[in-house]
């Protein structure tokens, strides 16, 4: 590891931890956006000028009219009025605005660290991964929304991929922040067997997160609204009679 000064290590490490906090809240905001059915309320992707919301009734009506053209409005929300539209618009707008804020929270300190020559070639590559990865998450978010404009909802698989991309970026930031703050000093040591088990648990966790996103997106949990058993059974008797 490059011999960074303690000041540099802490500055970059805590900056990365801030990124983790921002991603955490972005995932929460994204979850609220999905639960309120707000994700398709903004039918355009304008990374720069889209930061400015409608400012008068004419602009609001124009934005609402664009929403009226998609399938979701025609089949699910045809009785929605402008006031109700503003409520779902808020969450999707807030979700996108937070993403822009995250971008500035990364780029401005990143540029400062480069100016101060605090970043060597190795760390530059690792931080570059964050920049590209974050861009991919944002771009995929729009691809996901655009795909959903032709249906009633955003496809659940798309939602799960979007979530996993964000959580993977979160995990990468945690690892890199720990690397900067502690260097080669491990927080604790584990036997190789436990390390392998730990990796297996992480893989299973990610699979469960993917499945959870799909179940949530399809509202499949409503089929068995009991816990911990499914209508009193560990393996529901209807399992063999059901098909996708």
PLM-predicted stretches and their roles:
Residues 58, 102-108, 164-180:
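Hydrophobic cores of alpha-helical transmembrane segments in multi-pass inner/ER membrane proteins
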Residues 11-22, 122-131, 187-210:
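Interfacial segments of alpha-helical transmembrane regions
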Residues 14-51, 203-216:
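N-terminal signal-anchor transmembrane alpha helix
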Residues 32-44, 139-159, 163, 215-229:
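Interfacial helix-loop-helix junctions of multi-pass membrane proteins
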Residues 110-118, 175-185:
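Structural signal for the C-terminal ends of transmembrane alpha-helices
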Residues 119-133, 144-164, 185, 189, ...:
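Membrane-interface helix-loop-helix junctions at boundaries between adjacent transmembrane segments
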Residues 66-104:
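Individual transmembrane alpha-helix segments
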Residues 210-244:
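Membrane-interfacial catalytic/cofactor-binding modules of polytopic membrane enzymes
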């Amino acid at each position: 590891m490059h011999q960074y000064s303690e000041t540099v290590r802490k500055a970059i490490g805590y900056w990365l931890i801030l990124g983790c906090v921002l991603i955490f809240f972005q995932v929460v905001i994204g979850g609220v956006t999905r639960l309120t059915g707000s994700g398709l309320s903004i039918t355009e992707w304008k990374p720069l000028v889209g930061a400015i919301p409608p400012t008068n009734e004419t602009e609001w009506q124009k934005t609402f009219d664009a929403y009226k053209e998609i399938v979701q409005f025609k089949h699910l929300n045809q009785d929605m009025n402008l006031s109700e539209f503003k409520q779902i618009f808020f969450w999707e707008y807030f979700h996108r605005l937070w993403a822009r804020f995250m971008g500035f929270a990364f780029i401005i300190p990143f540029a400062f660290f480069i100016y101060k020559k605090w970043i060597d070639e190795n760390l530059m590559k690792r931080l570059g991964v964050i920049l590209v990865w974050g861009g991919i998450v944002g771009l995929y978010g729009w691809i996901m929304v655009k795909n959903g404009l032709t249906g009633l909802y955003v496809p659940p698989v798309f939602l799960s991929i979007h979530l996993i991309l964000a959580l993977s970026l979160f995990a990468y930031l945690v690892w890199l922040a720990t690397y900067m703050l502690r260097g080669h000093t491990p927080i604790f040591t584990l036997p190789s067997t436990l390390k392998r088990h730990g990796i297996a648990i992480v893989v299973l966790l990610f699979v469960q997160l993917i499945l959870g996103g799909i179940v949530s997106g399809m509202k499949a949990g409503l089929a068995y609204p009991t816990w911990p058993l499914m209508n009193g059974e560990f393996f529901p008797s209807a399992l063999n009679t059901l098909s996708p």
